[in-house]
Amino acid sequence: MKNDVVRWSRQPTSNTTNSSSSSRSDSNSTHKHRSKSNKLNARQLGSNAARSCQQRSSVATTLEDEQQTIIECDIGNFNFDCNLFKTSFLTQHKQKRSGKSSSKSKSNRSRPLAKTKAVFLLALQFSAVVFLCNINVGFVAGSVATAASSAGGSSPAAPSSAPSSPPTVAVPPPPPPSSALKVDPNGQSPVLPPYVLDYETGGKAKLTPNNGKFGQSGSSGSNNNHIVGHYTHTWAVHIPNGDNGMADAVAKDHGFVNLGKIFDDHYHFAHHKVSKRSLSPATHHQTRLDDDDRVHWAKQQRAKSRSKRDFIRMRPSRTSSRAMSMVDAMSFNDSKWPQMWYLNRGGGLDMNVIPAWKMGITGKGVVVTILDDGLESDHPDIQDNYDPKASYDVNSHDDDPMPHYDMTDSNRHGTRCAGEVAATANNSFCAVGIAYGASVGGVRMLDGDVTDAVEARSLSLNPQHIDIYSASWGPDDDGKTVDGPGELASRAFIEGTTKGRGGKGSIFIWASGNGGREQDNCNCDGYTNSIWTLSISSATEEGHVPWYSEKCSSTLATTYSSGGQGEKQVVTTDLHHSCTVSHTGTSASAPLAAGIAALVLQSNQNLTWRDLQHIVVRTAKPANLKDPSWSRNGVGRRVSHSFGYGLMDAAEMVRVARNWKAVPEQQRCEINAPHVDKVIPPRTHITLQLTVNHCRSVNYLEHVQAKITLTSQRRGDIQLFLRSPANTSVTLLTPRIHDNSRSGFNQWPFMSVHTWGESPQGNWQLEIHNEGRYMGHALLREWSLIFYGTTQSIGPNDPISVPKPSGSEATTPNSSSTTSNLHQAYSPQYPRIPPNNFGSSPSGGSKLPLGKVPPPNKSSYVTNNPLLNSAPPKQGYQQISATYGVILGKANGKSNNNSKEKTNNKGNKSNNGNKGKSGGSSGNRKEQTTQSTIIQTSTSKNKYYRISQQQQQKNNKQDRNGVQTQRPKANSGEKSYDEKSRKVVGEITTNSGNGSIKAAKQVKESTTTSSNSRIPKLFERYEKIQAIFPELEPYENSSPKGKPKQAKQGKQFEVDLFKPTNGGNSRQGNTKKSPSVPPPSQTMATLSILPILPAGGSSFLPDQKILKKQQLLMAAAGVMAPAQVEVEMEEVHATPDYEARKDQRKEVNGPNAQITQWDMIFYGTETPAQPDDVANPSQSNQFNLYGNDMAHNDVEYDSTGQWRNMQQVGEVGMTRDHSNTAACLKWSDRKCLGLSLLFFMIMQVFFLNFKHANDNNNKNKNNIIKCIR
């Protein structure tokens, strides 16, 4: 029984049954007698009353004797038949209600009273549960002792709904064993194991009896019907030197069957006498393998939940259009070639594969394997390119990957993906593969129980023959799963990238996921956020973000796929020798990327797996992809959380690959922050800073991982942001409304590729938001940063993001300053969580596997995973590549007054004004200490702050995050602060294009010898930072006569891309600042009207005419000298006598003014003035209910609303979510709690009044009986 409260109750005695039956018959006769006569004599009434009292006491005794054990209280479904507390008033009154409802001789006046009381009690229970849920109190009542019973016996005390028949006590029959529990045929105990919350089960209690998984057979073609988390009859066994027949001997001695080799010295065993689906491990067989000296390690395999990443369309898409198409550019006679818009659309709106084909690049000689549910090898469009050496059936353990056919064709996924890659061209049938000259194979591994051994064996299939592995599946995209590859699959990734393709590394391409509707984040998928895989996202026909797409920082690039209603989909092969035009989801994107990778490998066979990733980053096209989260990283590359670095360009990748030189050896540097144990209260956030100065082996970043150990009352309330030293803002984790797990994260690696090419040296900031409610505290235990990259640059012209800090480096006692390359040991990428989450050893196998260290080569990796022969590092400060001096918001070190170099490390800033501070010393320092600073911003500062408080600081100190600006001491010629002026670049947010641009506030200081009498008095005390136009510097800098004027090295004009976030996020999501660049030239510094532009990046430059008109208006108002209006905006390069003329102009001109406020007023009409006027097409996209999730998806504004209704499933899921965060999302905290308390108090009042009235009725009834007697 699914999602219901399950109870066990013992059988009542025969006397009770007879009493119940007699009560039913007597009650019926009494009812008939009342309907016939209007009078009752005193003797008859007294007899009925005495009998009623006797039977009421008998029923109450029976109810008290029944012992009921609650299996689970499902609060999510609001089932209120569970005893929260056995001695609570709810249970007592419920038993009283049950006893009274079983009475035979109730009067007409007492029946409606009992019904009213039952309604009030039910409302009272509802109020109590809502109150407990709102204050985030979780509980589990009863003990897990047995399994579910039938639906009819789930509520034994439920009153009858029919008013004609009196209620009776329902006694449930004993549940049959088949419906209660799946009993192991080996005679193992049917008692369920305790709840197991670990990453192996996706962070969910898969073994609970109310999840509907037990007892279901499940068809072989439907992966979702399999029992998730159960123990299978297979083992993974490590037998050193097992190839000489020892593995077969071990299997035979212990009754196993050797299914084959997984990879080096690891074998796949099966025992046919063990149940294929068991709730408990087969400890007897596990012990026998552990006691065998020939076996180094063995572990029984458990099933994993893996889903295919496509979806079913409600109706087919529209047909293809030949407008602006390059269909005729290639003479293909395949019937579906005109409809393959993503290959032949032209105009820069396709994958640009036709130019590569014209160069003779078709993927010939490259082998691609599809890891999926099988491959129809005899398909007319696949059989010519089918490669049997690249195929295997892991589910049935044979060489034929043919899929299992069923009524719904559920195993068509692999055949569709294979057709995208290598469908035969010019065969007058179906489609054309993007690499139609490549060889393709298939691995059938999703059509059965998917275990760690099954995944590892699929990923390790013939790595010297197969070049590319394409996978369009992964953990459930339900918005609440956190899962990744197990220990064997992780080892398979490492083996493939280090030894595959003759040492150049196998290429693993993965679909990013289809959990966008559930607001899932692909950084919770351990396959897509792995450094070994190339994660691919999707774009619609119009270049929008699909409604199913997930956003995360690990996505590297994008290919086309399906979109909304009316947009075209992907054409490919299908089961039964057919063709389809409706392949969908990110499942269709990954095979297209695999086909492009095959073209690139044909052009250069010497490319490594890292070379391909570098080529993708350098050639991806951000153009024509619409997403508000586009930003520039520290080296000027555009990157997005939805599209990665952009759309893959096949022809450009082939061109670059032909002349590509192999990248240097990849280095690895890990920095372990000290143990923090930092509590994060609800609705707050903390900022942690980690300064990196010792990772000398990594100067150019590729991948960055943030390993975090964190616990939370609700994992979905956690948000993570990372900011690099080059001010690249990365969103590591977004809120997940369906994730109610309390297991948190245990050393989970959140990966980012957004800092590709930057330098790791400098201050890194990790910002953790807790959007929980009330008592939903979070606790950060530890975190670390892992940098992957190279020591030397890849190209001679690659930009440098952040220069290395100068000065000597000091080391603290609790750290070490060593770096490690890839040949040294490091912690496993995806550690396993023990069942109890307290560090106990995992089940199965007391021995650790023994691995061989691969010989040194490019990209060589050795891990301390149990599968390798290296001891795990000790807990603490192993492999620390930086030193730590823990400070609290203050600079560590003294500044040098002679310094001309400043380091400006800006902290993360939230919407409510919280600012993180980071300090540091500038100039040449004798001693330099790396800082690990924890900054908790719990107070809010007003945006209007006193200027007078900013003027008491010393000269030449760093500007700390734009909050406090230290200005030099006043000279003797300065009278007071009122005679000083400040250059202020304010903070402004403008809507331009698809995103919002926010200029960071900057304060530039200068002094003047005369007072500005026209400045309002208000701005002598306050500055309205966010209301000042950033491009106009209202004050001119005038130097004293006779002193040389130095060019001022002001701060850059920094641009933030503002991305609004859904829910109660108190932080601006995905803010992106421009990189740090060399200071502007003297001409740019002295020209006060021109904005300071960042090198190599675009900036918001106001229109010249607008600025000139503004100057004319200011001159007409008398606030600007007329001579200053003559300054032309085009005058960028100053003449030699420019400074002299400027100083002379300043002496003649009057005092300057400051713009205090500016507004824009629009006058117009809502509709066109004339019926023939063309409507503005952009107005339909101005309002968006989805925030930025669907801001550029035109299906959002479909006139029919049909596809809009399907996309609203995500919002419906929000309303159906019974968690406290989703339930109270529409109301504020106080309103939600207040309404619950008010409802609870009202119910209590009704209950007390009703109880008082009932007591009075009982007293009156007793008085009547006494009078009759």
Swiss-Prot record:
It is an enzyme of class 3 (hydrolase). Residues 38-57, 858-868, 1005-1014, 1062-1074 have a biased composition (Polar residues). Residues 662-793 form the P/Homo B domain. It catalyses: Release of mature proteins from their proproteins by cleavage of -Arg-Xaa-Yaa-Arg-|-Zaa- bonds, where Xaa can be any amino acid and Yaa is Arg or Lys. Releases albumin, complement component C3 and von Willebrand factor from their respective precursors. It is found in: Golgi apparatus membrane. In adults, isoform 1-X is expressed in CNS, fat body and female reproductive tissues, and in embryos, in CNS, tracheal pits, hindgut, posterior spiracles and anal pads. GO terms for cellular component: Golgi membrane; plasma membrane; trans-Golgi network. The active site is at 372 (charge relay system), 413 (charge relay system), 587 (charge relay system). Residues 340-654 form the Peptidase S8 domain. InterPro entries: Galactose-bd-like_sf, Kexin/furin, P_dom, Peptidase_S8/S53_dom, Peptidase_S8/S53_dom_sf, Peptidase_S8_Asp-AS, Peptidase_S8_His-AS, Peptidase_S8_Ser-AS. It holds the Pfam family P_proprotein. Residues 975-985 have a biased composition (Basic and acidic residues). Glycans are attached at residues 15, 18, 28, 108, 333, 426, 606, 727, 814, 857, 897, 908, 994. The keyword Thylakoid does not apply. Its cofactor is Ca(2+). It is a multi-pass membrane protein. Keywords: Cleavage on pair of basic residues, Disulfide bond, Glycoprotein, Golgi apparatus, Hydrolase, Membrane, Protease, Serine protease, Signal, Transmembrane, Transmembrane helix, Zymogen. Disulfide bonds join 430-579, 522-552, 669-695. One of its GO terms (biological process) is postsynaptic membrane organization. Its EC number is 3.4.21.75. Residues 13-28, 150-163, 811-821, 835-851, 905-915, 929-940 have a biased composition (Low complexity). Furin is likely to represent the ubiquitous endoprotease activity within constitutive secretory pathways and capable of cleavage at the RX(K/R)R consensus motif. Belongs to the peptidase S8 family. Furin subfamily. This is Furin-like protease 1, isoforms 1/1-X/2.
